[in-house]
A protein has these predicted regions:
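Long, charge-patterned amphipathic interaction tracts in eukaryotic proteins
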Residues: 40-116
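N-terminal interaction modules that seed assembly of large macromolecular complexes
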Residues: 2-66
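Intrinsic-disorder-associated interaction segments
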Residues: 12, 32, 36, 85, ...
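Short alpha-helical interface elements
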Residues: 30-34, 44-48, 64-75, 119, ...
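Phenylalanine-focused residue identity feature
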Residues: 2, 24, 53, 71, ...
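A near-ubiquitous, low-amplitude feature marking generic local secondary-structure context
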Residues: 2-6, 79-82, 122, 126, ...
């Protein structure tokens, strides 16, 4: 699944590093000393999940079909023009980012509103004739949001293990 996601994203102009860059920018606002390699690792982890595989593949295919004018009726123009009140693309993004809870969804909202990096480039390119990234820009932003949340979780877990006064226990130990 990871390799297929990587392949279709690359075909649409998206690299793992470009997603990891957004992950880094998003999480470095809240966490000191995160590494880009941890961001790349988190993006790769997200891209290996079955649900994300389905979202990435579907998003890319819908955008491709819209570019080829394969939809009929008003939905063709709605998708191709990325109309503002069409929210299915954001709903898919919320679903992906929601894999990491409400913090993931909050991160997605921030990335979606303040578009930067590859998300901005996809959004801007989608306004050019013959190009549609209606779904892809949101899915890429959602992957970055989920990866950012994963980085926060991993980092906080590492910090907790460093604390000398913190004792781990399991409910099964009680």
């Amino acid at each position: 699944m990871f390799e297929l996601n990587k392949k279709i994203l690359l075909k649409r102009g998206v690299t793992i590093d470009s997603i990891a860059e957004i992950t880094f920018q998003q999480q470095s606002k809240y966490t000191d000393n995160i590494s880009r390699s941890m961001c790349v690792e988190s993006v790769e982890k997200i891209l290996s999940l079955r649900d994300v595989f389905h979202h990435v593949q579907l998003a890319c295919e819908i955008d491709r079909l819209a570019e080829e004018k394969m939809f009929q009726g008003p939905i063709q123009d709605i998708i191709y023009e990325d109309l503002g009140l069409f929210g299915i693309d954001e709903t898919m993004g919320l679903d992906v980012s929601g894999l990491y809870g409400t913090i993931g969804q909050t991160n997605f909202g921030d990335i979606d509103v303040n578009k930067h990096g590859i998300v901005k480039r996809l959004n801007d390119a989608g306004k050019e004739d013959g190009i549609c990234h209606t779904f892809l820009d949101d899915i890429v932003g959602a992957i970055a949001a989920a990866a950012s949340t994963r980085v926060a979780q991993v980092t906080n877990e590492e910090i907790a293990h460093e604390e000398t006064g913190v004792k781990r226990f399991s409910i099964f130990d009680i």
